[in-house]
Amino acid sequence: MTNYIYNEDGDAVGFWEDNLIFAMNGRPVGQLNGPSVHKLTGEYVGELYEDMVVDRYFEDIDRIPPTPVRRAEPAKNPGNRGATSYGYPDVFEQLLD
């Protein structure tokens, strides 16, 4: 089963396997350290919360070591799940910088 990541509009923008986050095309874009989301370089971005990458306003989250990456098979788009907001800004796009 694919673990999708959605944006505020409800569109699937990525997915995660093990500790890696991928764009829908299979390109690795980030890594997980528990619920904390980091760029591949180790820089903190936000938290995985309710299948979204959001800024929960945590401060002083340390960088983590860069991780070896692999490309994944592109994910099939599950369709829109409906717009959802949990009161935290969606920051998935920061992984694509």
Predicted regions and their residues:
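Long terminal segments
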Residues: 1-3, 43-97
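Generic recognition of long tandem-repeat/solenoid scaffolds
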Residues: 21, 37-39, 53-55
